[in-house]
């Protein structure tokens, strides 16, 4: 999983993906939110694709990720996640 990779390698792929999805897949907006150069964001998104196989150009994949992140946020807001 991306979280495991982040823990093991000190990367930030999970938050990068989450912010990219929350920015409606707008790379400039996501890069600004993450305080990254757009090239760095692109590198991370490519790395995420190679690690997970996720097609970030597929609308169904984006919808699935968006819903997953929103559900996670709701659970965190209610302190329901461990």
Residue ranges of each PLM-predicted region?
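Cytosolic nucleotide-utilizing catalytic cores of signal-transduction proteins
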Residues: 1-82
């Amino acid at each position: 999983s991306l979280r495991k990779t982040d823990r093991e390698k000190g990367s930030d792929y999970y938050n990068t993906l989450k912010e990219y999805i929350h920015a409606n897949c707008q790379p400039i907006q996501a890069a600004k939110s993450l305080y990254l150069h757009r090239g760095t964001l692109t590198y991370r998104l490519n790395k995420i694709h190679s690690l997970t196989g996720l097609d970030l150009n597929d609308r169904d994949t984006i919808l699935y990720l968006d819903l997953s992140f929103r559900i996670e946020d709701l659970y965190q807001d209610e302190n329901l996640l461990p």
